[in-house]
Amino acid sequence: MTPSLSAFINSLLLGLFIVVLPIGTALLLVSQSDRVTRN
């Protein structure tokens, strides 16, 4: 694997991590908080 490809994959994973983590946390918090309304 070339250094540029490795750097590209690393940045892709980092971007994915930065995007997915807050969204996942927000969804989790919302699903925890409105559990009463959806029974």
Curated annotation (Swiss-Prot):
It is a single-pass membrane protein. The keyword Zinc does not apply. It comes from the Eukaryota. Its main location: plastid. The chain crosses the membrane at residues 11-31. InterPro entries: PSII_PsbX, PSII_PsbX_type_1_subfam. GO terms for biological process: photosynthesis. Signal peptide: none annotated. GO terms for cellular component: chloroplast thylakoid membrane; photosystem II. It is found in: Plastid, Chloroplast thylakoid membrane. Keywords: Chloroplast, Membrane, Photosynthesis, Photosystem II, Plastid, Thylakoid, Transmembrane, Transmembrane helix. Involved in the binding and/or turnover of quinones at the Q(B) site of photosystem II (PSII). PSII is a light-driven water plastoquinone oxidoreductase, using light energy to abstract electrons from H(2)O, generating a proton gradient subsequently used for ATP formation. Belongs to the PsbX family. Type 1 subfamily. PSII is composed of 1 copy each of membrane proteins PsbA, PsbB, PsbC, PsbD, PsbE, PsbF, PsbH, PsbI, PsbJ, PsbK, PsbL, PsbM, PsbT, PsbX, PsbY, PsbZ, Psb30/Ycf12, at least 3 peripheral proteins of the oxygen-evolving complex and a large number of cofactors. It forms dimeric complexes. HAMAP family: PSII_PsbX_1. This is Photosystem II reaction center protein X. The gene is psbX.
